[in-house]
C-alpha cells in the first residue's frame, strides 16, 4: 500500500519510479543479444574505422563501461569526461599508462546551467546496488526514482564547460564516436553538439530519461541532419550514412 501511494504522488509531478529489476533485465538482455553495442563497436574497430572518440559521463572507466576494452586494445585517441572527483581520480588511474587518452574533470553543460550534481553520499553508498554509483544526476528525482532515499543523497558542486569549449580545449577536429551517458542530460548535450559543430560522428546516448517533448525535438534534428538511428536497450544509436556503421 505504501509503495502504491508513493507511485501515485510521484506520478502527479510527472515522475515514475523505475523498478530495479526492470533496469537489470534490460541491461542483461541487451548485453547478450546478437545486436548489441559491444558487437557493433567490435565490428567497427576491426575495420579500423574507430580512431577517435569523446565519452561524456565516463565514471571510473570500468563500471558499466562499453568503451574501456576498445580504447585500450585499439589505441583509440580519446577524450573522457567525468565531473565527480572520486570517479575522475579512478578514471585517471585506470588510463594512467595510455598517453593517447585525455581526461577532463568537468560536466558538459548548456548555457552554464549545471554547477552541481546529486549523488548517493559516501556514508550511504553501501546501502544500495552497484548501479547507484553511475546514476549521479543534475536532478534529485532521478536518484529517487531509482529507489534512493532522499536523506541518503548529497549535492556536490562541480566544474562545467560547454561542448564547444571542450572541443576547442582538446582541439578535436575529427571524431568517429560521441558516447554520452549523463543520466537525463544526454539529450541536451547531443542536441547542442549537432547544432554547434560540423563534426558528424556516430552518436550513442541514453534516451530513457529525456523528456518526451525535447526528445521529439532531437529526433527532428537528427532527421534534418540525415542521421539514421535505432535503439538498443536504453540507448539510441545514431550515425550519418557515410559511416556505414551496420555494414
What is the predicted function of each stretch?
Residues 1-247:
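Phosphate/nucleotide-binding beta-alpha loop and adjacent structural elements of enzyme active sites
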Amino acid at each position: 500500500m505504501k509503495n502504491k501511494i508513493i507511485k501515485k504522488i510521484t506520478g502527479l509531478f510527472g515522475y515514475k519510479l523505475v523498478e530495479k529489476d526492470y533496469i537489470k533485465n534490460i541491461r542483461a538482455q541487451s548485453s547478450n543479444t546478437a545486436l548489441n553495442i559491444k558487437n557493433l563497436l567490435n565490428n567497427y574497430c576491426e575495420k579500423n574505422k574507430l580512431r577517435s572518440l569523446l565519452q561524456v559521463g565516463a565514471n571510473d572507466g570500468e563500471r558499466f563501461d562499453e568503451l574501456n576494452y576498445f580504447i585500450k586494445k585499439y589505441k583509440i585517441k580519446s577524450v573522457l569526461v567525468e565531473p565527480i572527483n572520486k570517479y575522475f581520480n579512478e578514471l585517471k588511474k585506470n588510463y594512467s599508462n595510455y598517453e593517447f587518452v585525455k581526461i577532463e574533470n568537468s560536466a558538459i553543460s548548456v548555457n552554464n546551467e549545471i554547477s552541481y550534481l546529486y549523488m548517493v553520499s559516501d556514508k550511504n553508498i553501501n546501502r544500495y546496488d552497484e548501479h547507484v554509483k553511475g546514476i549521479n544526476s543534475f536532478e534529485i528525482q532521478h536518484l529517487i526514482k531509482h529507489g534512493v532515499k532522499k536523506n541518503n543523497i548529497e549535492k556536490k558542486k562541480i566544474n562545467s564547460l560547454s561542448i564547444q569549449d571542450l572541443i576547442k580545449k582538446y582541439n578535436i577536429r575529427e571524431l568517429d564516436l560521441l558516447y554520452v551517458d549523463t543520466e537525463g542530460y544526454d539529450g541536451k548535450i547531443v542536441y547542442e553538439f549537432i547544432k554547434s559543430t560540423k563534426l558528424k560522428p556516430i552518436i550513442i546516448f541514453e534516451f530513457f530519461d529525456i523528456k518526451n517533448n525535447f526528445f521529439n525535438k532531437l529526433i527532428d534534428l537528427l532527421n534534418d541532419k540525415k542521421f539514421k538511428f535505432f535503439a538498443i536497450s536504453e540507448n539510441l544509436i545514431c550515425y550519418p550514412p557515410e559511416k556505414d556503421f551496420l555494414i
